[in-house]
Amino acid sequence: MIGMLRGHVESVDAVSAIIEVGGVGYEVRMPSADLASMHAGQEIKVYTSLNVSQDAITLFGFGTLASKRMFLQLQKVSGIGPKVALSLLSTLPPDRLARAVADGDATALAKAPGLGKKGAQKIILELKGSIDLSQIEGSSATASTPEDTGAEQVVEGLMSLGWHQQDAAHAVQTVCADNQIETPLNAKDVPRVLKLALTSLDRGR
């Protein structure tokens, strides 16, 4: 079992990153917020979970242990596989996800692509009361080292305007790459990236 990787980011796209460890490149699927804060050459530590199915062997990665724990917890719900669990963590950070379960907020959970209202209600029914909030809350830092608080600010700004976290994080990553804006973002770049990301999202409607 591969439980953790420490190495350098070789490349990153909208759904996964290649992390080079000792000359071997591992393809790791990760939540959107983690991917948005990563860049080639960056040294990072990623907590991982290996999923083996009939069709593929997939390595999932997370910037925090809390995020990994939530990923595993979600899969205890019947009918919830790793793809939907990752979709949930790309829509809501682990602390907000745990709070939504605790509060019975099916509407917040149902925003995750591939889930739906019935699936959200099932998660609440099966997990409510079983998640230790003290281990989750306040633990939404991404895999970035140092943390890319600038990118997080942009993503939060886009979410306040009604965009899903997954779409917002992808837009931030894309506009930074397309416009050669270095990450972690400097404070002075935040307004520009927010404007570019918003334009990109509006164009894609």
Curated annotation (Swiss-Prot):
Annotated region (Domain II), positions in chain: 64-142
Region (Flexible linker): 143-145
Any single GO BP term: DNA repair
Compartments where found: Cytoplasm
A Pfam cross-reference name: RuvA_C
Function: The RuvA-RuvB-RuvC complex processes Holliday junction (HJ) DNA during genetic recombination and DNA repair, while the RuvA-RuvB complex plays an important role in the rescue of blocked DNA replication forks via replication fork reversal (RFR). RuvA specifically binds to HJ cruciform DNA, conferring on it an open structure. The RuvB hexamer acts as an ATP-dependent pump, pulling dsDNA into and through the RuvAB complex. HJ branch migration allows RuvC to scan DNA until it finds its consensus sequence, where it cleaves and resolves the cruciform DNA.
Record remark: domains: Has three domains with a flexible linker between the domains II and III and assumes an 'L' shape. Domain III is highly mobile and contacts RuvB.
Protein known as: Holliday junction branch migration complex subunit RuvA
